[in-house]
Every structure is written in structure tokens, then in C-alpha cells.
Amino acid sequence: MKKEEKTRLRREKIITAALFEFATKGYQVFVINELCKVDGIAKGVLYHNFSGKSDLYLTCIQESFEKALAVFLGVDGQVPSLADYMERCHQFYQQYPEHSHIFFEAMIATPEELEADIAPQKAIFLDLNEQVCQKLISESKLKEHIDEKRAMAYLRLIQDMFRSYYLTVS
């Protein structure tokens, strides 16, 4: 096996172990020493691949956000209807429980020190949420006393509750 392949496999092993630990404990409680001890990862190998806890978390976030985007947009890559979007969120949670927990933690309870690093990825999903909601509103007939702004605020609230549910479900 070539050196590059070994390095890639070691890196994947670390990421897989970290995904589980971050999903189980969250960013704030996660400890690298514990990860190394529980999963038999040498600290030197971990620090050769990642600069520390935040770098490892950001790598897990990137992977989780990529998987989420693939599931949410579906095969056609188009903005889904609200019903399809919610179903795909649930599908993401079912298929990728660790990734979904990390994803929802990043969306709802972003670690303060990583907000700037995670903001571009969050923006992609916030924009997708807006597009899904706009699509729903454009296809709906609103009551006279409800304008688009109020409808959007209501839909955002529902989405926040939905994400919170998946963050707290174990």
C-alpha cells in the first residue's frame, strides 16, 4: 500500500471516530485525549493530520454539510418543495445520524470560536431554506392579513424547531 493511501485511510479512521464522539458529546465536551484513548489513535498520527480539536471539528462539519446538501437537493439538484425538503431532512437524520447531529449542532449551536469558519457553509443552507420557503409561498395563496414577510418568519420558526428536534433526539 502506498504512503498516500495509508495516510488517507488513517485520516478517514480519525474522522469516523471523531464524527461519533462529536455527535455523542458535542464540540464543547469533546476531548482529543479521550478520542485517542477510546479509538486507539496515536496522538502523533492525529496531530500529523489535524492541527487540533477545531481543525478536526471543521473537517467533520465539512463532510456533514456535503452529505446534507447532497441529500437535501436530491438526485436532480433542484430546490425541493417544502414537503420533500422536510422528508429529506428526516432521511438525512436516518441515514447519517452522526453527520446529522453535527450538522444541526453547527446550524443551531455553533461554537462561538468557530462561527466565522462555519458561516460560509451555514449560509448555503440558510439560502436553501429561504429558496424552499419562497417556493412554497409563491405556490400558495396567503390569507389577506398574512403578507410574505410574516409567512417567511413563521416558516423560519418551524424550521428552527425542526432542527432543534433533531439536535436533541438521541
Regions found by a protein language model. Name each.
Residues H90-E130:
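Short secondary-structure transition hinges
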Residues T59, F72-E98, E148-L155:
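Hydrophobic alpha-helical connector segments
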Residues L69, E113-K141, K149-A153, L157-S164:
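Amphipathic alpha-helical packing segments from all-alpha helical-bundle domains
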Residues Q62-A68:
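Short, basic, alpha-helical segments at the C-terminal edge of helix-turn-helix-like DNA-binding modules
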